[in-house]
Amino acid sequence: MTADLFDPLDTTELAVEPLADGAMVLRGFARSMQDELLADVHAVIGAAPLRHLITPGGLRMSVAMTNCGALGWVSDRRGYRYVRVDPERGAPWPSMPASFTRLAALAASSAGFEGFGPDACLINRYEPGAKLSLHQDRDEHDYGAPIVSVSLGLPAVFLFGGSMRADKAQRTRLQHGDVVVWGGPSRLRFHGVLPLAEGEHALLGAQRINLTFRRAARALL
């Protein structure tokens, strides 16, 4: 069976690559939904344009970001947090597309996390040279829900570390359509992305799009 024909509803032939207890890569899981996903990505970006956020320390992030769902993750001089209203537009974030919620729930279930219902999706655009430093996802209220991360476009090297920043990180090459899920004992592991290498993807050109689904309920300001 080819990746293009793979139906994520049928997990009998799913290629699963374990990373740690409660963490794994679902190889090619999203590829059969790529057309719908990319159309919805473009619609969200059209409504809430990508932007380069500033860290609390005043540094400009190399990755461009936007959000959809009830909550959106933002960063500025005030810190990291989830908000209901896009601070640049003064309006709620776009609704999360049905294709997003379906994929996130299916991927989480395939990784052993039943009943996952994300209320936040962070859309990251990586262009060559963009990276994401090692960090933990700690701004959510309930660490019992997993993280679901979908890769589209150019390949990237994903870093998956331990419970401390100094722990040695595994390096895993992620391809178009791969989905990483981590939760349970791995929920607070450090993770990041090495600088994106130059390249050209048939559908997305010289970029990588990452969709990160979280349950962030009550982590509001």
Which role does the model predict for each range below?
Residues 1-221:
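Non-heme Fe(II) oxygenase metal-center motifs and adjacent flexible, charged/small-residue loops
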